C-alpha cells in the first residue's frame, strides 16, 4: 500500500472522539505557529 492508503485506513479506524481530539491538536499547532 502507498503511505496515503495506509493513512486513510488508519484514520478510518479512529473513533470520532479521537478524530475531534486530533482536529483540536492541529488547531493548537496552527495557533502556536502564528504566535
Swiss-Prot record:
Residues 1-28 have a biased composition (Polar residues). It comes from the Bacteria. It is an enzyme of class 3 (hydrolase). Residues 1-35 are annotated as: Disordered. Keywords: Hydrolase. Its EC number is 3.1.-.-. Optimum pH is 7.2-7.5. Poorly active at pH higher than 10 or lower than 5. The keyword Hydrolase applies. GO terms for molecular function: hydrolase activity. Highly cationic enzyme that can bind human or rat immunoglobulins as well as serum albumin, and could therefore be involved in post-infectious sequelae. This is 30 kDa neutral phosphatase.
